[in-house]
Amino acid sequence: MCGIVGYIGQLDAKEILLKGLEKLEYRGYDSAGIAVANEDGVHVFKEKGRIADLRAAVDANVKSQAGIGHTRWATHGEPSRLNAHPHQSASGRFTLVHNGVIENYVQLTREYLHDVTLKSDTDTEVVVQVIEQFVNNGLDTEEAFRQTLMLLKGSYAIALFDHENKETIYVAKNKSPLLVGLGDNFNVVASDAMAMLQVTNEYVELMDKEMVIVTDKKVVIKNLDGELMSRASYIAELDASDIEKGTYPHYMLKEIDEQPLVMRKIIQTYQDENGKLSIPGDISNAVAEADRVYIIACGTSYHAGLVGKQFIETWAKVPAEVHVASEFSYNMPLLSEKPLFIFISQSGETADSRAVLVQVKKLGHKALTLTNVPGSTLSREADYTLLLNAGPEIAVASTKAYTAQIAVLAILAAVTAESRGKELGFDLVKELGIIGNAMEALCDQKDEMEMIAREYLTVTRNAFFIGRGLDYFVCLEGSLKLKEISYIQAEGFAGGELKHGTIALIEDGTPVIALATQEHVNLSIRGNVKEVTARGANPCVISLKGLEEADDRFVLPEVHPELAPLVSVIPLQLIAYYAALHRGCDVDKPRNLAKSVTVE
């Protein structure tokens, strides 16, 4: 949600900011703006809409070597040019961009801004106005910035520009990601590494409640007590080409096609020199010794967690629960004596999940994070981390991260089962290899998936997904993909729940996509298909080879049934993609959605 870019150096800041913001589009936004400084003053450009709209509004003749930029996802105040960042102080001396939520902005307004008329509806403007009030009362900019930060309650990543000192950008963070990229006679600030790869791949991570003074020659990190902090730098394991679409029309399609490669990479990552699956011993021991596992996640990661729970309970024989992070924070269940918490987050920055992590760490419990981003907040704050190694996922709708999460959870469960002396009953390495081949075969059948999307989903307003057992969990993910990018009201249901209310929604022509990959419930789901067909539904059955029937719309390659979610989801991803495409929707950047949800 939202994104920040800042630059100070010798190059054209305007172009670096715009290109950086383009790399942050995947995070979700509804407006954008930049502020650049030169000898003529500070020039602010803001627009509601896409970065392309902002680029068109920027004066191409303005040259600058310093500036800050922002993509906004509205939390306080409607999406508009007025509420877009950057925001300026009353005198125009200070310009500021901010990600996060300032929870006490109303109180700050009452206490410090009696004589200031706010121009926007945002919490952000309050921050820059308070900074100016402190400067008006005699403090220098750095001290005014520090004093203001000490007043703030909530989450923030902030970049501040003082027009009387155009050689410095002031930066701070708390509960919202922010990096400082290091260069030769320049430095950059960004919400994530993708925005800075155009100029550097070396960066330092900021910790909560730290402030930074950034010039073209130096980066000075301090805590809010004013004490200097030392920090090692990292090299981003990304190349600029990793975040390009290449020949693909959309990132989502590219990322769907990358799933076979990701599967093979995961197998290689978690194999030892003898070809045996392996994870660090302290992690498998932590799971094996737990009396209950609590999986915490949101959205797609939650759906992956539902599948992972089955692996952990069925293979490792460890009781497991799956909880939506935002609900767990406020309704924590009665915990077991020796729990292990597993947090699943593609970005590693999900605010709801982090809030739970903070809670359980205070209680003294151990936590494991599954994430795609090394060095992310969740990976730093958890006791253990398992990386997905899926590569950058740019499209807002997650695809390859979902299957990577399931694969890593399967490996975790299998290794834990072995450490507990439990027999898996099959060779997981071999079966995951078969999965990779099946994924490849499915990705080669896009024409068939497009035909299904046209036939069932081009004009409908509603769609239902039904399944039983593991298929039900995949139906939840399939329905989420469809609603995310096509805006069709799609819902996933357990087949057995149809008769308890849902079947009342079935009418002539209602699309019902049914998964049939589990032999022990095959007759039951077939009965559910007959139920909805009798009431006028238009059924689309996707079955596993060996379980197919004559009227099935599509048959999946044969794979181990317990791993079927890794392949059955791919047709659902492709069907959602083509449904959105033919309905004229923005596939990679659906309305109102953010890739990385960094506010609660």
UniProtKB/Swiss-Prot annotation:
Cited PANTHER family: GLUCOSAMINE--FRUCTOSE-6-PHOSPHATE AMINOTRANSFERASE, ISOMERIZING, GLUTAMINE--FRUCTOSE-6-PHOSPHATE TRANSAMINASE (ISOMERIZING)
Gene Ontology CC, one term: cytosol
Transferase keyword on record: yes
Pfam families, sorted: GATase_6, SIS
Coiled coil: none
Primary enzyme class: transferase
Protein name: Glutamine--fructose-6-phosphate aminotransferase [isomerizing]
Alphabetized GO MF terms: carbohydrate derivative binding; glutamine-fructose-6-phosphate transaminase (isomerizing) activity
Catalytic reaction(s) noted: D-fructose 6-phosphate + L-glutamine = D-glucosamine 6-phosphate + L-glutamate
Organism (species): Bacillus licheniformis (strain ATCC 14580 / DSM 13 / JCM 2505 / CCUG 7422 / NBRC 12200 / NCIMB 9375 / NCTC 10341 / NRRL NRS-1264 / Gibson 46)
GO biological process, one term: protein N-linked glycosylation
Cellular compartment(s): Cytoplasm
